[in-house]
Regions:
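Sequence-level detector for tyrosine residue identity
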Residues: 14-15, 87, 111, 119
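C-terminal cap of metal-dependent C-N hydrolases
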Residues: 73-75, 79, 95-128
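Active-site-adjacent C-terminal substructures of enzyme catalytic domains
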Residues: 1-86, 101, 127
Length: 128
């Protein structure tokens, strides 16, 4: 897209509030709009704190691909927060906020619901 705008998907709020109008994922995808995925964790409209659950819901409710959900919780989420370049990427000079998962394929992150497949966290370290 020509804009720097990021569409933020909040599947937890969609589910909790019993919304019926699904975000226009196909149109956003066709237009090249970056799509972030977030929990919007709060006690009123989205009591979901697991980013993996949000990824699963983005795939199952909004028909995002597992790759889009992963990109939506990393690169696009950082961009939505104005943190692109330092976060959401794995490359030299970036600030590490990494989760190491017990998974054999990245798509598994969107698959498992209610189980913790986190192996280890690496936080606030510059990657070299």
């Amino acid at each position: 897209s020509k804009s720097n705008a990021v569409a933020v998907m909040l599947p937890g709020a969609f589910y909790t509030l019993k919304e019926t109008q699904v975000p226009p994922i196909a149109a956003l995808r066709s237009a090249g709009v970056d799509m972030a995925v977030a929990t919007d964790c709060n006690p009123g409209s989205s009591p979901i704190s697991s980013i993996l659950t949000a990824m699963n819901m983005a795939c199952s409710q909004f028909f995002m691909t597992p790759e889009e959900a992963l990109k939506g919780t990393t690169i696009c989420a950082a961009k939505a927060l104005g943190l692109q370049g330092n976060y959401g990427i794995i490359e030299p000079g970036a600030l590490a906020e990494l989760a190491v998962w017990n998974a054999t394929h990245p798509a598994e992150l969107s698959y498992w619901v209610g189980s913790s497949i986190l192996h280890k966290r690496i936080s606030h370290r510059e990657l070299s």
